[in-house]
């Protein structure tokens, strides 16, 4: 089974760049405190890196 990471949204998307809002939706995050589990791939890591100030990552 592929390694997964837990991603939790910690800050609001209100007033953010449209690109950042789209990245959050691409990760499946909809609201503050929402947690999703995603495969640990370079694509997902890149998305997390783009909005790192708005999310928390657990290995």
UniProtKB/Swiss-Prot annotation:
GO terms for biological process: translation. Transmembrane segments: none annotated. It comes from the Bacteria. The keyword Ribosomal protein applies. Keywords: Ribonucleoprotein, Ribosomal protein. InterPro entries: Ribo_uL30_ferredoxin-like_sf, Ribosomal_uL30_bac-type, Ribosomal_uL30_CS, Ribosomal_uL30_ferredoxin-like. One of its GO terms (molecular function) is structural constituent of ribosome. One of its GO terms (cellular component) is cytosolic large ribosomal subunit. Pfam families: Ribosomal_L30. HAMAP family: Ribosomal_uL30_B. Part of the 50S ribosomal subunit. Belongs to the universal ribosomal protein uL30 family. This is Large ribosomal subunit protein uL30.
């Amino acid at each position: 089974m592929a390694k997964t990471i837990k991603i939790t949204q910690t800050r609001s998307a209100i007033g953010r760049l449209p690109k950042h809002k789209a990245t959050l939706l691409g990760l499946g995050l909809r609201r503050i405190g929402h947690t999703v589990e995603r495969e640990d791939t370079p694509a997902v890591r890149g998305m997390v890196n783009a909005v790192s100030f708005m999310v928390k990552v657990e290995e």
